[in-house]
Amino acid sequence: MHVLIHSPNGYPFTLRSLVKNDSGILGEFFESLSPQTRSKFGPHPLDREYAKYVICKNIDVDNVSRFIIVTETQVVGYFIVDFNEYPNEGSRYSSYGIELDFALDPVFAPCIHDNYQGQGLASLGLDALLRYFDKSKIRSLVLMGGTQEPNLLARNLYKKFGFVEIGEFYTDYNRLNNVDMRLVR
Ligand SMILES: CC(C)(COP(=O)(O)OP(=O)(O)OC[C@H]1O[C@@H](n2cnc3c(N)ncnc32)[C@H](O)[C@@H]1OP(=O)(O)O)[C@@H](O)C(=O)NCCC(=O)NCCS
């Protein structure tokens, strides 16, 4: 996919699928993320090596769709749509009475560059992604690891797009409540 998006303040960005050659700019993006952002978004190691030797190396075989929002020079947003089995999500949702099939109900995780958060970029990106997914077999998007209860920006983003809060769970490592949210299409 390749979509031009205009931020509310008029700047043009492109939302597109990640490709092998993106390892450099993706690694720079990961390494630029602040501790605050890392504390809310930690799906995998966020460094250059991981971008190059794991993500971009396995791009065609890892069963994950990844999308980036880019300016002419840098990555400012990153979306993961992962079709692999997530046993923790599977059992939590099962406890809510929902049986996930990750081929149809992939897990979803977004991250926007610190300098661009709260400016409408994730909203524009998610809107374009959901339209792109119209032609796909995707039945729902399941938030990877839920979202931290105090992360109001994320929760508001998800609510705005129709994600529903399904349940809550506590994690020891950050001593926080997390909210499971899912968007059924
Ligand atoms: C969460 C995140 C992906 C949202 O992306 P974003 O581009 O900053 O979000 P948007 O600017 O599109 O805002 C989405 C909605 O959040 C709400 N919002 C915006 N700023 C807010 C703020 N400071 N506090 C609370 N809610 C806010 C608004 O409802 C907004 O929609 P609206 O402007 O149409 O009303 C991004 O901030 C981010 O990467 N944060 C750090 C990592 C993270 O939390 N990832 C998600 C883990 S679950």
PLM region spans:
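A short, internal acetyl-CoA/4′-phosphopantetheine-binding micro-motif in the GNAT/acyltransferase core
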Residues: 68, 96-102, 107-118, 146-148
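Conserved acyl-donor/pantetheine-binding loop and adjacent beta-alpha core of acyl/acetyltransferases
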Residues: 72-109, 172-173
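Conserved GNAT acetyl-CoA-binding A-motif
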Residues: 104, 133-147
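Conserved acetyl-CoA pyrophosphate-binding loop and the N-cap/start of the following alpha-helix
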Residues: 116-128
